[in-house]
C-alpha cells in the first residue's frame, strides 16, 4: 500500500498494478490495514483541524468517514489483531497520549498512557499494547483484556532505550517495532558518535600534485 500525494493507492502484488482507493485534496498518510481486510485507517491533514484519522471501508459503499475530526491532532493508528479496536495517539489532553477505541465507536475511547506516549504497537495475541514514553527514552507495556469491553492494566516500563533518534532530533515518534511473538523489539538508536572530526586545510595544494624533480 502506498501513497501518491495526495491519493492513497493499493498495489496488486501479482500484477504490480496500482489502484487508487482514496482521493482527497488534503495530504494523506496511511496508518494501518485491518487484519480482517475490511478497513484502512489513514491520517488526513487539514488547515482547520490538523491531523485527523479517517476510516476507509473496503466493502459496502466504500465511502471514507471520519474516525476523528477534532480540533486536536490524532495520528499513529493501528488495529488490534481481532480488528475490533484501534490504538492511536491524540493530543486532546494537551500532549500526545495513547488511546484505544472501538473501530466503529471512536467516541468510546479509553486513555491508555498516563504520562504521555506515542507509537502504539499491539502484540500478536492482542493481550498487550506497547508504546514509547513521552520523552522517547523507554518502551512501555499495558496488559489488555480484549472483548466486548476493554479492560486494561496500568502502564509499566518495559525497558529503556537511551537517547533514541526521536529524542535527539525532537520527532514525536520513536522508531521501533515488535516481533510477532512479542519477545523481541527492533529499536532505532543513534550510531556511536566519534566526536567532532578534524578538518585539515591544505594550502597551495596544486604544488603537491607536481612531480618531484630528479635530484
Q: Where are these predicted regions, by residue range?
A:
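Conserved blade-ending motifs and adjacent loop-strand segments that build the rim/top face
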Residues: 73-74, 107-120, 154-177
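Conserved loop/turn at the beginning of each blade in beta-propeller domains
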Residues: 24-26, 70-72, 113
Amino acid at each position: 500500500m502506498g501513497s501518491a500525494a495526495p491519493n492513497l493507492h493499493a498495489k496488486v502484488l501479482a500484477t504490480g498494478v496500482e489502484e487508487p482507493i482514496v482521493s482527497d485534496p488534503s495530504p494523506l498518510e496511511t496508518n494501518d490495514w485491518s487484519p480482517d481486510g475490511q478497513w484502512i485507517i489513514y491520517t488526513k491533514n487539514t488547515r482547520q483541524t490538523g491531523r485527523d484519522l479517517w476510516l476507509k471501508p473496503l466493502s459496502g459503499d466504500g465511502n471514507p468517514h471520519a474516525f476523528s475530526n477534532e480540533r486536536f491532532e490524532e495520528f499513529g493508528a493501528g488495529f488490534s489483531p481481532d480488528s475490533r479496536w484501534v490504538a492511536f495517539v491524540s493530543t486532546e489532553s494537551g500532549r500526545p497520549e495513547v488511546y484505544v477505541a472501538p473501530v466503529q465507536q471512536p467516541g468510546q475511547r479509553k486513555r491508555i498512557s498516563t504520562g504521555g506516549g506515542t507509537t502504539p504497537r499491539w502484540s500478536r495475541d492482542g493481550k498487550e499494547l506497547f508504546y514509547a514514553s513521552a520523552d522517547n527514552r523507554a518502551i512501555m507495556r499495558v496488559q489488555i483484556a480484549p472483548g466486548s469491553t476493554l479492560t486494561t492494566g496500568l502502564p509499566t516500563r518495559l525497558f529503556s532505550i537511551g537517547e533514541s533518534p526521536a529524542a535527539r532530533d525532537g520527532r514525536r515518534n520513536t522508531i521501533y517495532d515488535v516481533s510477532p511473538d512479542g519477545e523481541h523489539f527492533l529499536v532505532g538508536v543513534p550510531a556511536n558518535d566519534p566526536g567532532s572530526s578534524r578538518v585539515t586545510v591544505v594550502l597551495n595544494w596544486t604544488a603537491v600534485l607536481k612531480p618531484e624533480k630528479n635530484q
